[in-house]
A protein has these predicted regions:
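Beta-propeller fold detector
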Residues: 355-357
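Aromatic, loop-rich ligand-recognition surfaces of beta-strand-rich domains
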Residues: 292-352, 361-404, 425-456
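Sequence-level motif detector for i,i+2 pairs with an aromatic at +2
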Residues: 33, 67-69, 375, 388, ...
Length: 456
């Protein structure tokens, strides 16, 4: 009430990154007794530095007037040239709010920035829009992806054509983009984007072999060739794109084919468990980060936790559960992103849940062993708590395999890692540096070794 009326007050919205809406402005304006100056935290990426946001500018209400907001400022990325596409949209919005159209403005911005490489830049930009967590943005809206079980020849061919376009984008941008400063900023992402195009295209070609079902050897060889190495993943994680549809298609396609292929060989359900939960991203490939046998990676909810939320594992079949090990938090035992009041439960049908342990309080490391319980699903469920942080899990192991539980004799130079050769899960492997000796159980009629390559 006593603040000089000429002083403008910045406001970032309901949360740090949020839309500009009449409701937001009404809330703050009624308290500061003047139209606020809106500080929009977009396209800033200081919370996701491995992304470079190139999508349309939307989330800015077109009914607002100077009576509601006295100004709008955009917080850009540290990449000045790459921020210009979003800044073009923000300027367009503030110039003529009532008639602003996000897609039309975006199309004009692409043309202004790269007049001789617009098509290539557009292909990259439309697939480099989402943040993967937090302030989510639409991405790849013109592209239809699918699971292998939903295969349709026409849809598959259309997606393959898109991946082939993506594969060519880096070279086309190098040739046609006259803004060398923009090209320099985008180049690391363009490089990884092109690789995504290649592995996506090859996943579709691999699926055609898989669906024919008559050439296991050819499928396996091409499957191994199209896997991402540790180095590939590190490079992609550093400069991500296509996170909403394209990379998930690749991951899901490879996983679905691996599951079906191994099930065919085993005659039983493989043990390639899936992450599940109550959060919006619980069904995405992000949950694989708590199942990758690497405690330096983690699954995170990406939104604040609330009572009743849970994180768990689908064992794909009803199994005897005798051991569970969970590491909560992102990277340490003093992290804030965890359930500080929780209970460990299991279920055969996903509806009726049975507690396995008493209520847990402020426990990052959770271990349970007991008599066999028939279950397909295991979960850690949040109970009443004041905590509103994200929830993160570094590791969620159910029935972790131990050498002594294999049922046959085994000798190797690395007893801790060798179990991954026998865990019925194609996402894991064991690298033989010297020799591997194992007993073939009595009554075994066939034995199949799935290998990457042999060095003689």
């Amino acid at each position: 009430n006593s603040l000089n009326p000429d002083i403008k007050v910045f406001w970032t919205g309901d949360v740090v990154c949020s839309d500009l809406t009449p409701e937001t402005m009404e809330w703050i304006n009624s308290r500061i007794k003047r139209p606020a100056y809106y500080w929009w935290n977009y396209p800033v990426t200081d919370y996701i530095r491995n992304f470079i946001l190139q999508g349309p500018v939307y989330g800015l209400d077109t009914s607002l007037t100077k009576e509601n907001v006295c100004g709008v400022v955009s917080n850009p990325m540290e990449h000045g040239e790459a921020s210009k596409l979003a800044l073009y949209g923000v300027a367009d919005y503030t110039w003529n709010i009532a008639n602003y159209n996000p897609i039309d403005s975006w199309e004009r911005g692409l043309q202004e920035l790269t007049p001789k490489a617009k098509d290539a830049y557009r292909t990259f930009a439309i697939h480099s829009s989402d943040t993967e967590n937090g302030y989510r943005r639409d991405e790849s809206w013109e592209t239809k992806t699918f699971r292998i079980a939903e295969w349709n020849d026409a849809t598959a061919q259309a997606l393959k054509t898109e991946f082939e376009k993506i594969e060519k984008v880096p070279a086309e941008m190098e040739q046609g983009c006259e803004n060398k400063a923009l090209l320099q900023e985008l180049r690391p992402w363009l490089t990884e984007f092109g690789k995504l195009g290649t592995r996506g295209k090859q996943a579709i070609e691999l699926a055609q072999i898989y669906r024919s079902g008559n050439d296991d050897s050819s499928f396996w060889n091409k499957y191994v060739q199209n896997l991402m190495s540790k180095e590939d993943r590190k490079a992609y994680e550093a400069h991500k794109s296509g996170t909403l549809k394209l990379q998930p298609f690749y991951e899901n396609a490879m996983d679905d084919m691996a599951h079906g292929f191994l099930k065919k060989l085993l005659g039983t359900t493989p043990k390639d468990y899936k992450g599940i939960g109550s959060f919006g991203n619980s069904g995405t490939i992000l949950t694989k980060l708590m199942l990758d046998n690497d405690t330096t990676t983690y699954y995170t909810s990406g939104i604040g936790q609330k009572e009743g939320d849970w994180i768990g594992v689908d064992l794909r079949d009803i199994r005897d559960v005798t051991e569970i090990s969970i590491l909560q938090g992102r990277n340490s035992v003093d992290d804030v992103d965890y359930f500080d009041h929780a209970i460990l439960e299991c279920s055969a049908d996903g509806k009726t849940w049975t507690p396995l342990i008493k209520e847990l309080n402020k426990q990052y490391v959770i271990n349970w062993k007991g008599d066999a319980v028939k279950a397909r699903y295991v979960r850690l469920k949040r109970l009443e708590s004041e905590r509103k942080n994200y929830a993160s899990v570094r590791s969620f192991e159910v029935n972790p395999l131990h050498v002594e539980n294999l049922g046959f004799k085994l000798e190797s130079e690395n007893p801790q890692q060798v179990v991954y050769a026998f865990d019925q899960n194609l996402s894991t492997f064991y690298k033989v540096s010297n020799t591997l000796t194992f007993e073939v159980p009595q009554g075994t009629k066939t034995y199949t070794l799935l290998m990457d390559k042999l060095s003689v």
